[in-house]
């Protein structure tokens, strides 16, 4: 049975880099993986393939939208570690609906029976946009994963994504697998957030520059580690995420949280920071 994942998060948070490394980790665990990029920039799979692959929407336009004239090899490209890659693409900037293209991508892949060929399908979805079109992958997903950092904006975006998961979970067995903290030196705000909106934290990746560099190089951390074994410890973070997903965790249906309440909670963290206990003790001694 195919396990389907949908990766969301604030724009620029590192979803595509995270997705590519999770896909690779799943492949390293012996799974046949398909990663579907759902972003008009069509750069989701760049880290796996090393180049911008042709998009499904471009291929459909070339064939005048005759689905019967398209073969799997026309739209599916082989990436690192044997991960198969698809890019949905999108309309020209400022014209059309990118969410519609996501729907057409799913329709074509179903026509090609591609969904039945894989152990794991991973949707890497544009930013924190959760309109009907870009929320479509949630209709097929078993689990949603939210990429964040220890910052206000990313966690507030996570709240909106969690609300979409809750809505979609009304009609099928979608669950939120948890948060992935990407390139963050702290997790105190993440911990404050999950106190208000309980959900698992799958992994917290430290502030490692090689994660950012891997994106520029068009390589996964696993591929970089082949020539630089010192990076193997970074790969272990992604393998840990893969192992948790493959264990098919229970996950959660996120509880409801009002925007204003969560906004106040997160902003209060910055406006009224609590002093470390050691510092408070020092101040008390000074006052005596």
UniProtKB/Swiss-Prot annotation:
Record carries keyword Signal: no
Binding of Mg(2+), residues: 16
Catalytic activity, as annotated: chlorophyllide a + oxidized 2[4Fe-4S]-[ferredoxin] + 2 ADP + 2 phosphate = protochlorophyllide a + reduced 2[4Fe-4S]-[ferredoxin] + 2 ATP + 2 H2O
Domain of life: Bacteria
Chain sites annotated for binding ATP: 12-17, 41, 182-183
GO molecular function ontology, one term from the record: oxidoreductase activity, acting on the CH-CH group of donors, iron-sulfur protein as acceptor
HAMAP family in UniProt: ChlL_BchL
Name listed for the protein in its UniProt record: Light-independent protochlorophyllide reductase iron-sulfur ATP-binding protein
Source organism per UniProt: Synechocystis sp. (strain ATCC 27184 / PCC 6803 / Kazusa)
Protein's gene: chlL
């Amino acid at each position: 049975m195919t396990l389907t994942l949908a990766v969301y998060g604030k724009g620029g948070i590192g979803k595509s880099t995270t997705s590519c490394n999770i896909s690779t980790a799943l492949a390293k665990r012996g799974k046949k993986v398909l990663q579907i990029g759902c972003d008009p920039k069509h750069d989701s799979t760049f880290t796996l393939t090393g180049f911008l692959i042709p998009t499904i929407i471009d291929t459909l336009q070339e064939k005048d939208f005759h689905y019967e004239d398209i073969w799997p090899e026309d739209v599916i490209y082989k990436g690192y570690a044997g991960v198969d890659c698809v890019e949905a693409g999108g309309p020209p900037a400022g014209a059309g609906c990118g969410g519609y293209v996501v729907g057409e991508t799913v329709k074509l892949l179903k026509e090609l029976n591609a969904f039945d060929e894989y152990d794991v399908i991973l949707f890497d979805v544009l930013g924190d946009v959760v309109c009907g079109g870009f929320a479509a992958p949630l209709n097929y997903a078993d689990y949603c994963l939210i990429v964040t950092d220890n910052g206000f904006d990313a966690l507030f975006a996570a709240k909106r994504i969690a609300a979409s998961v809750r809505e979609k979970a009304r009609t099928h067995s979608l669950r939120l697998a948890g948060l992935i903290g990407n390139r963050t030196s702290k997790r105190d705000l993440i911990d404050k957030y999950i106190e208000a909106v309980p959900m698992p934290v799958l992994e917290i990746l430290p502030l490692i520059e090689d994660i950012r560099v891997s994106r520029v190089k068009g390589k996964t951390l696993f591929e970089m580690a082949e020539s630089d074994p010192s990076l193997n410890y970074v790969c272990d973070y992604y393998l840990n995420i893969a192992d948790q997903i493959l264990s098919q965790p229970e996950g959660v249906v996120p509880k409801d949280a009002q925007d204003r309440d969560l906004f106040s909670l997160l902003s209060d963290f910055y406006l009224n920071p609590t002093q470390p206990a050691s510092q408070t003790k020092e101040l008390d001694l000074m006052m005596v």
